[in-house]
């Protein structure tokens, strides 16, 4: 019995001993709470705090609510005494600390520590303890009451209610700054903890199994020798090759994109090779073309291919039906005045005018003339044969090219071996002639020829023939160190036929010689006052102009043409359009081969080579030769007058300009008539 009693006693003692040990090892609830709070305060510093947001903006309140929840806080939708902090964006929230009702607002952390450390927390949940009331006089109480009435915070507002309940008021800027600071601290803690964990994983990474696989060739793989980084790879369809022809900034492994021509050739070669394999028959590759789908309003159905639909029976029956025969009959009666389609009309080729860029001819063109000569054109009619010579001064005319026939002028200049020879106009008896002939063909061709000078005599012939001047001859034409003064005077006389009427009437009374502007081109043709051009009416409708020089021409005149060292000057031919105005001449009983004593003198002016602009050409045409020139009116075209003569007086300029403009193409130049 004793033994059993001993067992029971020991068992009871053992149990009691275990209970004592358990009581010693079991921690109290208060100690558990105090141990867990510091850990939570590190990770979530706003744990156990209740907030109320007094913010008008929904987005700001949602963002702030999310940050508070991340830090362990809680947001309530209704304001009550259980709320720890009120967050507002009003100005009064900043000045709540300066008010006499409450003490300065502590931070949430300090408020939390105050709650935990205070042994006797207040009943309203706030750590604020009202100071002991001091007995004040009646006057001071009235003053404080007046101050309270004029307080910044209005009564019956959220802030005033929070102050009355003892809720801490925080401005939104303060809570934002506090949240940012806590986020930085948490980020540093997490970073340090992850680094420690990564170190532990690296130690045990060798034991972990990794997924392995085989790469298909060809591939490129890059591995790290230290095995700190995992390898990366790239699988390719074809092994790349280096392109040496590519430029420097580009990668040498970039493949040049084949052009469309190369693709076509590759397709053709492939077709040929396939054809050779199958007994020489070419196999056409079926290329998939996108079919144009649409809707036919005539057949009221959709189609996938237009051509197949047009060839279908349903569409052909609709097109060939007689339902619209009435409309076709009405349309056929209408007048066809439609414009031809561009594809149907043949394209007209544009006429190309060859305007060559002539090389400049280096020359000192003219001598410095000491005197400015004026040449007068005398208008002679049959009534004025016995009167004195009348002159018409300084008139410039521009005649339009209305005739279809082309009149071309040829200026042929040949080298003169002797530099001391002088160009002189002599009489017909002395075999020096200057003749103008007009053939009875469709085109009246005028050519001016300068022949080489003889030792004693010089010849100047105006021959009518058709020649052309090439651009190569113009480029070779260079006049170096020559000074040329072409002198001549053209006299125009009118001859009529006998009363027999065997000779037909001439259609021409006036000959307009093409010329270039002396001012621009500096090419002066000065005719002497005594030589003349004689216009003769012949039975073969030839217009012959002969230049005669009187016997009393002095051998040495100041106006002479000196040609020096002109071996390099080839014969030049220029086409010019000349307008000839032909009038009706009455048959009068005058002797043939009769010559009027009165002769008209005029000067031929050179034509502008290329008109740069229509405005400039007009200005050049209507520009007078002298500053003080006067316009004396147009000459009258009477039936009795044989020839209409106009005076053009040009001023000679002392210049050393180029001679290129003298040989210009006729397609672009306009003729300035007399």
UniProtKB/Swiss-Prot annotation:
Biased amino acid composition, Polar residues: 113-130
Residues noted as binding Zn(2+) in the record, renumbered to the chain: 296, 299, 309, 315
Compositional bias (Basic and acidic residues): 21-40
Reported modifications of this chain: Phosphorylation increases its interaction with PSIP1.
Up-regulation conditions: Induced in G1 phase at low level, increased during G1-S phase and remain high during S and G2-M phase.
Single Gene Ontology MF annotation: nucleic acid binding
Motif Integrase domain-binding motif 2 (IBM2), residue numbers: 655-674
Domain BRCT: 40-128, 154-179
InterPro entries referenced in this protein's UniProt entry, alphabetically: Replication_Regulatory_Kinase, Znf_DBF, Znf_DBF_sf
Annotated localization: Nucleus
Phosphothreonine PTM sites in chain numbering: 273, 345, 553
Region Disordered, annotated ranges: 1-40, 100-131
GO cellular component, one term: nucleoplasm
Pfam (any one): zf-DBF
UniProt-listed GO biological process terms: DNA replication; G1/S transition of mitotic cell cycle; positive regulation of nuclear cell cycle DNA replication; regulation of cell cycle phase transition
Modified residues (Phosphoserine): 312, 354, 359, 381, 413, 508, 625, 667, 669
Keywords tagged on the record: Cell cycle, DNA replication, Metal-binding, Nucleus, Phosphoprotein, Repeat, Zinc, Zinc-finger
DBF4-type zinc finger locations on the chain: 289-337
Tissue and organ expression note: Highly expressed in testis and thymus. Expressed also in most cancer cells lines.
Motif (Integrase domain-binding motif 1 (IBM1)): 614-638
Subunit structure: Forms a complex with CDC7. Note that CDC7 forms distinct complex either with DBF4A or DBF4B. Such complexes are stable upon replication stress. Interacts with MEN1, MCM2, ORC2, ORC4 and ORC6. Interacts (via IBM motifs) with PSIP1 (via IBD domain); phosphorylation increases its affinity for PSIP1.
Record function comment: Regulatory subunit for CDC7 which activates its kinase activity thereby playing a central role in DNA replication and cell proliferation. Required for progression of S phase. The complex CDC7-DBF4A selectively phosphorylates MCM2 subunit at 'Ser-40' and 'Ser-53' and then is involved in regulating the initiation of DNA replication during cell cycle.
Name of the featured protein: Protein DBF4 homolog A
């Amino acid at each position: 019995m004793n033994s059993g009693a001993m067992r029971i006693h020991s068992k009871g003692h053992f149990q009691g001993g275990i209970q004592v040990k358990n009581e010693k090892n079991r921690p109290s609830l208060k100690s558990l709470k105090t141990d867990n709070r510091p850990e939570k305060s590190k990770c979530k510093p706003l744990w156990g705090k209740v907030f109320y947001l007094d913010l008008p903006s929904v987005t700001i309140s949602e963002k702030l609510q999310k940050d508070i929840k991340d830090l362990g806080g809680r947001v309530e939708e209704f304001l009550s005494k259980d709320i720890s902090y009120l967050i507002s964006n009003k100005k009064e929230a900043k000045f709540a600390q300066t008010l006499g009702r409450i003490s300065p607002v502590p931070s949430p952390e300090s408020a939390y520590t105050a709650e935990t450390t205070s042994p006797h927390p207040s009943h309203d949940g706030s750590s604020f303890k009202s100071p002991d009331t001091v007995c004040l006089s009646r006057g001071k109480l009235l003053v404080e009451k007046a101050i309270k009435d004029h307080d910044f915070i209005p009564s019956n507002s959220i802030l005033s209610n929070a102050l009355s309940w003892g809720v801490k008021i925080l401005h939104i800027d303060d809570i934002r700054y506090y949240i940012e600071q806590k986020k930085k601290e948490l980020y540093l803690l997490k970073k340090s903890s992850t680094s420690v964990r990564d170190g532990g994983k690296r130690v045990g990474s060798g034991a972990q199994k990794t997924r392995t696989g085989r790469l298909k060739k060809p591939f490129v793989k890059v591995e790290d020798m230290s095995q700190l980084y995992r390898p990366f790879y790239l699988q390719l369809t074809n092994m790349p090759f280096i392109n040496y022809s590519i430029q420097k900034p580009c990668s040498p492994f970039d493949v040049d994109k084949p052009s469309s021509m190369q693709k076509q050739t590759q397709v053709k070669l492939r077709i040929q090779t396939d054809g050779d394999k199958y007994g020489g028959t070419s196999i056409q590759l079926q290329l998939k073309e996108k079919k144009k789908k649409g809707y036919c309003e005539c057949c009221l159905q959709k189609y996938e291919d237009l051509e197949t639909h047009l060839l279908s029976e349903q569409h052909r029956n609709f097109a060939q039906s007689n339902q619209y025969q009435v409309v076709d009959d009405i349309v056929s009666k209408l007048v066809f005045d439609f414009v031809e389609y561009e594809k149907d009309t043949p394209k007209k080729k544009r006429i190309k005018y060859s305007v060559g860029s002539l090389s400049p001819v280096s020359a000192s063109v003219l001598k410095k003339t000491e005197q400015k000569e004026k040449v007068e054109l005398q208008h002679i009619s049959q009534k004025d044969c016995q009167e004195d010579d009348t002159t018409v001064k300084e008139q410039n005319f521009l005649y339009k090219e209305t005739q279809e026939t082309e009149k071309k002028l040829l200026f042929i200049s040949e080298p003169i071996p002797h530099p001391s020879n002088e160009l002189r106009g002599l009489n017909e008896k002395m075999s020096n002639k200057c003749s103008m002939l007009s053939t009875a063909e469709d085109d009246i061709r005028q050519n001016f020829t300068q022949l080489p000078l003889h030792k004693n005599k010089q010849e100047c012939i105006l021959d009518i023939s058709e020649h052309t001047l090439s651009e190569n001859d113009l480029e070779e034409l260079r006049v170096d160190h020559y000074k040329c003064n072409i002198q001549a005077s053209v006299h125009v006389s009118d001859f009529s036929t006998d009363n027999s009427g065997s000779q037909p009437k001439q259609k021409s009374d006036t000959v307009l010689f093409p010329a270039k502007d002396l001012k621009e081109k500096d090419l002066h043709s000065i005719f002497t006052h005594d030589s003349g051009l004689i216009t003769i009416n012949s039975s073969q409708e030839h217009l012959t102009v002969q230049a005669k020089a009187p016997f009393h021409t002095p051998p040495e005149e100041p106006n002479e043409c000196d040609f020096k060292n002109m071996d390099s000057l080839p014969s030049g031919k220029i086409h010019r359009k000349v307008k000839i105005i032909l009038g009706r001449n009455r048959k009068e009983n005058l002797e043939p081969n009769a010559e009027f004593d009165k002769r008209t003198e005029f000067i031929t002016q050179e034509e502008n080579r290329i008109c740069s602009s229509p405005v400039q050409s007009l200005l050049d045409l209507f520009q007078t030769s002298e500053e003080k020139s006067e316009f004396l009116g147009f000459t009258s075209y009477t039936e009795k007058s044989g020839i209409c003569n106009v005076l053009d007086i040009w001023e000679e300029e002392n210049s050393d300009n180029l001679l290129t403009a003298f040989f210009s193409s006729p397609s672009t130049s306009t003729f300035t008539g007399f």
